[in-house]
């Protein structure tokens, strides 16, 4: 009996130690974030057509002109600074009056963020119609919450779904880049069967995975042939097809 107790005690101690080490390892991994480009963020903050506010849950981009009544909850890619997306997303706010809510994922990992959609939509209570979207793994998380009642559409930014939405009535736009070395055009097409048949697929020439934000080069990515300004203009042009011109 004493021997069994000793074995159980040792086993529990080992399990607790391993769990602690894994937890510390996860925290360390998540703490290494791809920081947003300062100049790009400053440009976004200085845009007179867009008002930017920060809450505990998100960063909210609202038009200073007439709002369209539509909103996009945007989920960042894994370990990417949410502020890295400001410059690229202000384009569609400026052009259409769209409201954009960029989430601040738990531990900078969207897959660990299980907060409901209303945690973020509450930061923009005047929006009447919601679309969800995200970059890379953030897009995969957006797919998971796209079935919520208030959601009418989904935008995938260099991403693809892991869950089946093929029978949904969602309006879906999938934006990829010819130079994306992570969510390659082939990977995006291989996941097409999980999306509605009416999904619109677009591929921006010369655009890579990191072009969806402004956070520098990303390991494993392809080369971009565009400046940040050119990438922003190209992305905005594709989003206009879904959100319309203001």
List the model feature ranges, each with a label.
Residues 2-51:
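N-terminal membrane-anchoring alpha-helices
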Residues 69-77:
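Short beta-strand element of the alpha/beta-hydrolase
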Residues 81-88, 185-186:
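The serine-hydrolase catalytic nucleophile loop
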Residues 89-110:
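Conserved alpha/beta-hydrolase
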Residues 133-142:
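Gly/Ala-rich beta-loop-alpha elbow adjacent to hydrolase catalytic centers
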Residues 150-161, 171:
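A conserved short beta-strand
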Residues 168, 173-176:
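Short beta-strand/loop motif that positions the catalytic acidic residue
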Residues 176-230:
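Active-site-adjacent alpha-helix of alpha/beta-hydrolase-fold enzymes
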